[in-house]
């Protein structure tokens, strides 16, 4: 039986955390991951306001106490004054992984020119990969799954193609994926 993967989901939004409207980020992430990941998954969820200290505290708790293998944040990555998720992430990680943010912007630019305003990033804390995602459900699915052509073939790989191998490299569980959703790339060993 495959290893259980512990995934933290953090939605950062003043309005959703204040009950003004329902959060859409966490349900979208859970639905996408349920299709993509074949391992048993235990989700740990948090809805927090756009307060850097609160975001940092939640990321630390999930990585250190809850022992998450992977944490996704949604929202708070734009240029608005209250968008502080990247700053919170960079304050808690030990290694920045800038390729994730670069790839997210590349994917999103296929769909909207304002993707260039995104400040998404990623990094490693202990044995946990933390990745900032957009807040909108459609953008979450696009960045994780990538860009596909009319024939269904991959034009630009999504982030999730690299995540299982990254988790391998930092000592986490072996993540198996449904290749029709997101094929995990692992280099062949000679």
Model-found features: residue ranges?
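Non-catalytic beta/alpha edge segments that cap or flank active sites
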Residues: 1-190
């Amino acid at each position: 039986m495959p290893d259980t993967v512990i995934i933290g989901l953090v939605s950062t939004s003043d309005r959703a955390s204040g009950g003004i409207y329902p959060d859409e980020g966490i349900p979208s992430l859970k639905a996408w991951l349920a299709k993509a990941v074949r391992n048993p998954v235990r989700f740990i969820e948090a809805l927090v306001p756009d307060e850097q200290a609160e975001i940092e505290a939640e990321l630390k708790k999930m990585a250190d106490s809850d022992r998450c293998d992977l944490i996704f944040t949604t929202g708070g990555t734009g240029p608005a004054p209250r968008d502080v998720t990247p700053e919170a992430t960079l304050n808690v990680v030990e290694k920045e992984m800038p390729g994730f943010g670069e790839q997210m912007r590349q994917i999103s630019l296929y769909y909207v020119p304002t993707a260039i305003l995104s400040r998404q990033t990623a990094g490693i804390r202990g044995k946990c990969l933390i990745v900032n995602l957009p807040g909108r459900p459609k953008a979450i699915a696009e960045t994780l799954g990538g860009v596909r052509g009319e024939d269904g073939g991959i034009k630009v790989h999504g982030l999730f193609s690299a995540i299982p191998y990254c988790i391998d490299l930092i000592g986490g569980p072996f993540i198996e994926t449904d290749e029709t959703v997101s094929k995990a790339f692992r280099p062949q060993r000679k």
